[in-house]
Amino acid sequence: MFERIKVKKLNDHIYLMDDDGEATGYLVVGDKKALVIDTMNGYENVYDVVRTLTDLPLMVVNTHGHCDHIFGNVYFDEAYMNPDDSEVAKDHMAFQEFVESCKERNLYMPPFKPIKDADVIDLGGLTLDIISLPGHTPGGICLLLKEDRILFTGDGINHELWMQLNESKMLKDLLNNLDKIMYVTKEADFILHGHAHGVDNISLITELRDGVADLIETKGEGDKDYDWFGGVDKQHPFGDGKSAICYSIDKL
């Protein structure tokens, strides 16, 4: 039915939406309303996808302001995001390809409404706590689904953490911010991140935290190059060695 977005049911109220392997969004369905976490690239109508799964009133929350997490907002009336990522989102929304695509399809980005650390979303029977995690971007957030003990992390915690971007925080700041939220390891058992195909153990956050600390201590000595569309930076392995923190030298 849909060419790009493939839906995977994780339990009776959580759905993973895989946008052609490029980004992942989620739908959490409560008793009174449903929450869309990240709307992905916007090439395909994610609203229509969601409406095949629930007819409840919808709320959209973006974990951060990057294009592969917000461009699908064009199919909704409003979305919530941490205002600290407003400039990031503004820059991405100015991408020529996106501007031209919206014009051709008569689509518009809806306004962002603010959401902040310690806010609580009540879906009816399911509650999510907003947890600030500046790092990958200045306004990144996580969402803790308390009843299922699941932490949605966007790109702030994953197996290939991008810290080489202009908007990314210094690595010492990321370490400090990770230390502030380590309490979640006692409140969640699993992680669902912004490019996942399934769940990760909550231990990923500890592995990442220790990896950042090791990177700072070693100053990246011996780290290999990391080639990406923005140039060549560095990558520091963590955890089982298959995960990496991608960073630029000026973030050390």
Regions found by a protein language model. Give the residues of each.
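Conserved beta-strand hairpin/beta-sheet module of binuclear metal-dependent hydrolase folds
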Residues: E3-T52, L143-N158
